[in-house]
Each structure stands twice: as C-alpha cells, then as structure tokens.
Amino acid sequence: MNNYHRGHFAEFLARVYLTLRGYHFVCRNFVTGRGTTAGEVDLIMRRGRTLVFVEIKQRQTLELAAYAIADKQKQRIMRGAQSFLQKYPQYAGFDVRFDAVLIKLPFAVRHIQNAWTM
C-alpha cells in the first residue's frame, strides 16, 4: 500500500473510530486559502454542541505520529477552523475543540481530545 492509500485508509479508520464513539460526521479535507493563509482540516466531527477539528496522523508508531504534528500545521488547522465557522454560520454557537487521532496500521488508534487550543 502506498502513502496515498495509507492516508485515505487512516482517514477512513479515524472517521469510523470516532463515529463508533458517538461523534457525527460533518466534513472531511476542508481546505481554504493559498500559501501562508491556507487552512486545512482532515476531519470535522460533531458531538452534541461541540465541533471537533481533527488532525489525523499515521506513522510506524503512535509516538512518531504524535511528534508529526508541527506547530505550523496546528496554525493551518486553526485557520481552517476559523474559515469553516465563517462559511457555515449554523455552527457559530458551538464549542470548538482540536483533537488528534494517531494511527499505527493496521489497527492501533489513539484519540487525543484537546490536543491543542487556539
């Protein structure tokens, strides 16, 4: 399996994992802007009145996956979240959270709630 297919499988696995834990799918691969103003979110889920912006990382170990989320990437995700909330005002009153789902294939998954804050 090449990196492209591993990435798509990891996104699918994260979505199923969160759905089985009571989260509802909102959007995947939300992208806005270009260059330094770009925003990007792998997965957006909802649980109650909380909108969860999820970064998914798949590596050979869960520890390597955790270290792979750089500060620049967190900034892009936060810009993506701000853009999403502006584009979809029906979520304006929701609480916002940034989570990470770490994956070691074939099936080791770790969900980190509140992985970072704005």
Task: Locate predicted features.
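Short, low-complexity, polybasic intrinsically disordered segments
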Residues: K104-M118
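Acidic-basic catalytic patches of nuclease active cores, encompassing PD-(D/E)XK
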Residues: M1-F30
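Conserved catalytic cores of phosphodiester-cleaving nucleases, focusing on short active-site segments
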Residues: V41-L64, I77
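Catalytic cores of nucleic-acid endonucleases
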Residues: F12, G33, Q58-P106
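Glycine-rich, flexible loop/turn motifs
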Residues: V26, A65, A108, I112
